């Protein structure tokens, strides 16, 4: 962290601007495409101030200047010659799936970086730097923002950390249950990512600000729904049934970051939280995801991005910006030069499409609106002469625009056979990207017959499964114990309530281990059809993960005095456990054990015992 003895102003961090400006001046001497400037902006300009941004909040004038430098470089402007900024900066800084380019805005990035220091302050309680700050500035609980009100005696470093805590961290703090002594039952975020008061039926408990989770937990029975029911909805109660307190190991309640799937704080998730667009807009995520997946060079993708944002400088767009007196096409003189006219309907481009698009598809191809036309063709992975149609389509659009610009500005763009040229260029591009890009290259698959296999002599196999109708939604789990002959040793179904699919899977594992331990089985082979859950059980999970309380309970059984082997299997080998999980939806809430085979499961048990298999294509 910087040690500053004077008041911060724009001169304090002037060196950052000098470094960025000097780097840009060297690049401007080189001929760079828009895609090249974008790469440098994201990789270098956005990363140069990161160290300073991670330790202190920079003055707003510095942040504005950093954004200005990035903007002017990205669009190719210089002091001598200004260029049109085709898309507004806020759009450029939005995520790619929302139609942006993923460039980081300086102010939001600064706050996201400094908030990471604030998160560490809450997590690293015994670190020396944490102890010093806690003692000097009387750090309190994150729930109480009174200690975060700025004071004149604060240092610039602590003032920055406090702003990160107040404006970022406090909005994303959640809790993972342990012993329930710290979680405020009604006001903390620990179920569904929201306080229970925001999910209740409108009434407010009198002591809601002081009641902790342990106060409403009955050891050996679960939640005290007699006290909870009057203030909660049915959905909330179903979600509570999927959560338990750990009073056995004595694990404490832990902080979790609600804006990431694993509960761990990241600068990326904090930045996304700060820049989320809450204004209702059409969902264009599928369109732009499709656009960025096309196998073409980055310069073609960035042109497609301009097309998707309707920011290409056609005569219609130039006329709208008062840069041209007419919006008529300068090539055919036959109509308004709109985006669709340039890319498809102008005779200069139409001749190429007629020769490339099969006759049977031409009616639909030439009748669609701009976005429908782009989406259907950029997402078309069908082959055309061994090349995906999406690649050929994008290449034709790109070269059509280049040829058009060359014609208007008098450049020599002669090509004897343009259709042959674009096809050959598409083949070259596709082969280059197929050789260098791992994304999309799938491993070969072969068909194999998959079925349940009995355990070795002396072992009992436990198959478990979980199901969620909605993820999160109504959830259940099931499991079965069988010996080396395939005989039924016991089974269970669990109607959980409401939770996610991974949580349901873990409940199945927990009760499978519990069931086997109660039956005093010395050697267990646990089979689960979720690779994620197998990974949690074998390698562990961070304490901030939303499912860590369940993983800890499962590890409690794994550490007992017995042998447990954990194996991942395909669902075709786990059909009986899946059947018991789905059977639980027809039962009342809670755990149901079966010493005898339920009638609905007898056929599945018989098929497994007889060695029935089903085909599945698996990776080599």
UniProtKB/Swiss-Prot annotation:
Keyword Nuclease among UniProt keywords: yes
Show the InterPro entries listed in the entry: RNase_H-like_dom_plant, RNaseH-like_sf, RNaseH_domain, RNaseH_sf, RVT-Znf
**Reaction(s) catalysed (UniProt annotation):** Endonucleolytic cleavage to 5'-phosphomonoester
Q: Which GO terms describe its molecular function?
A: metal ion binding; nucleic acid binding; RNA-DNA hybrid ribonuclease activity
Q: What does the cofactor section's free text say about binding?
A: Binds 1 Mg(2+) ion per subunit.
CDD domains xrefs: RNase_H_like (cd06222)
The superkingdom listed in its UniProt entry is Eukaryota
Q: Where does Mg(2+) bind?
A: 465, 505, 529, 578
Q: Return the EC number.
A: 3.1.26.4
- UniProt xrefs under Pfam families: RVT_3, zf-RVT
Q: Which residues form the RNase H type-1 domain?
A: 456-586
Q: Which UniProt keywords apply?
A: Endonuclease, Hydrolase, Magnesium, Metal-binding, Nuclease
Q: Which cofactor does it need?
A: Mg(2+)
Question: What name does this protein carry?
Answer: Putative ribonuclease H protein At1g65750
Species this protein is from:
Arabidopsis thaliana (Mouse-ear cress)
